[in-house]
């Protein structure tokens, strides 16, 4: 029997390493191949699909990997995967150019909320990298900048005629990167910073899982996910910083004691003040809370951090510190049920005018369910439920939004929610090839929703021990099964199958 177990462990090691090696190679080729989003989005998506398939193979193989070495494998694999994002400039997003510009503007002592990149008052801050001239301005994706008395330049910054939309913690990060970057470093410091933060998320996941005596293999759902090198590292999306704060905050909230819950509230507040979207984890942070003071221990520090982070910019700015936020919401169609592909699945089933009210009611219902019945020791389970269904119903068109969802999957282990992240990638990459038709959004997010519902049904069915268990097998040191716990430990909790449905 021992010889057979050793043989299985050896085979699992070989399969895991082979899948990781292939995944790293495909991601490297995807990044090095160049910007094909406008030229060949279908071809680019095949590279994405290959990387996701290899990712699935790797996390499936690691289930049988010897537990004593799993931390080193998760970390080493995460480093290899993250490094692939550094092999080229941003390929499918220009957001990081705005980050670099906002950092430069702040370094000059100017509020990033006061001027647009097109404003002539900031001409002295322009350089040939962000504001090139000549033939390069005919490249798709570059926007013209009018300037009297000189050759008309263009800019790599998207929406150069509007004010920045990023919250204050994000802006502070942009300033820090600008201050620490050598002259002429261009996009690379933002990518390196994002890579380090993504590895920090892996470390935070491992710490939270270890504290819970949970299976450390779950961290591979984040560390090896293709969305991390492609969106967090290569495109350097600021969302990854919000993910780090959110994971650390939920880990602190899961600890007993008001002081740690307050620290968790501060960290979640920092996540919200980085990208706003992590506010969806707040219901999870309040899972099973019955007393007002317990809720206040999280909410008040979170709100205080958000308010305090805005204050310096309020005093420094002459205009609104919310920048283009309202315009962005309108542009993306979140304020109009009939615009674009937002609320696609709801609009498939209901009249357009019903979509927004139904979404609000549905998300409110999920939120109340989590707050009333969630397990306070596993706040990420409720956070995953609220975040996942919010994504399914909102059907966002940007793939990097799902970075938060991927991290919550790594904490909770319900891998089926990764289908929502893949759906976002499909909609974003294939959109140009299909004219951004709503049918693509319906197919992608509809398939993801079906997968979630099917797996929820499977998890609710009684099964013989060992046939259906956690998505990732527990280690020998894992948390004891429910029947082995003391009765008082089980009161007020939600079954895993309920939280993950």
What are these regions, as identified by a protein language model?
Residues 2-326, 355-501:
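Multi-pass membrane glycosyltransferase architecture that uses lipid-linked
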Residues 330-355:
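Membrane-lumen/periplasm interface segments of multi-pass, membrane-embedded glycan/lipid transferases
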